[in-house]
């Protein structure tokens, strides 16, 4: 209750401040070679939050209310998380993949001291996942983490009923044929890359999530970011996360016949 209340009030406060600002809020930077975009709440100007992913799938209390929930709300009435004089933006993800991501790697480049990189384990140390070699080693293995669990009792406490149907979220794989991937990217971007030659991570965040991805095709190349733009481009809906590595298979004349994406975590990983 305290976390959800803090997140909600932080969004209301942010909207109020943005509406009073003389500088327009920008969530997209584009030129002929690059599109960097993040998704927050710009999809709706007339209300503060919604039930979509960019609003933490906020559903209020009508969809998840019972005597225990009502009692918790009553017992914590008026309580919020604070960062000095500011209400904490207490956003969260389903599974960080072992290390939490920094806010500025997923949204506007404004650091939040309460939304930074932390190891999701009793042991606080972790490798430099902005380094491609370290990130690949991390993603291809299954390090100990609190979110590395298949315990149904634990998952039932933190996931909605429909989310509990997904079990391979700590480490996962997605495979595309050349035809599937090239058609998907063409449809999602509106650009004709021709056959896809490569997907190249140009920049990773603190949790190993790709923040800039270069798509290389026979006809053109283009760089996209941030994490949700990448996830939406490479999936009919969106990938579990942008913390992934790419294996190219059955390469003929420099063109792979298959792409295998091996990934870590579920969601943006922040919080």
Q: What do these predicted regions represent?
A:
Residues 1-271:
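Conserved, single-site charged/polar hotspot
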């Amino acid at each position: 209750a305290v976390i959800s209340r803090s997140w909600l009030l932080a969004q209301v406060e942010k909207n109020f401040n943005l509406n009073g600002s003389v500088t327009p809020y920008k969530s997209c930077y584009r030129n002929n070679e690059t599109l960097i975009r993040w998704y927050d709440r710009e999809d709706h100007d007339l209300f503060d939050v919604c039930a979509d992913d960019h609003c933490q799938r906020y559903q209020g209390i009508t969809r998840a209310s019972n005597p225990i929930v009502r009692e918790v709300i009553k017992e914590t009435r008026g309580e919020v998380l604070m960062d000095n004089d500011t209400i904490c933006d207490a956003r969260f993800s389903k599974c960080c993949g072992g290390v939490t991501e920094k806010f500025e790697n997923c949204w506007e480049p404004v650091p939040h001291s309460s939304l930074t990189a932390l190891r999701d384990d009793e042991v606080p140390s972790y490798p430099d996942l902005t380094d491609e070699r370290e990130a690949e080693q991390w993603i291809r293995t299954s390090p100990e983490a609190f979110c590395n669990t298949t315990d149904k009792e634990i998952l039932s406490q933190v996931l909605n009923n429909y989310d509990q149907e997904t079990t391979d979220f700590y480490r996962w794989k997605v495979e595309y044929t050349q035809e599937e991937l090239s058609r998907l990217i063409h449809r999602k971007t509106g650009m004709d890359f021709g056959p896809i030659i490569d997907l190249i991570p140009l920049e990773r965040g603190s949790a190993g999530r790709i923040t800039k991805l270069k798509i290389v095709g026979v006809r053109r190349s283009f760089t996209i970011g941030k994490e949700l733009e990448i996830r939406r481009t490479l999936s009919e809906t969106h990938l579990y996360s942008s913390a992934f590595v790419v294996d190219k298979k059955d390469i003929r004349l420099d063109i792979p016949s298959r792409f295998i994406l091996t990934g870590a975590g579920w969601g943006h990983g922040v919080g």
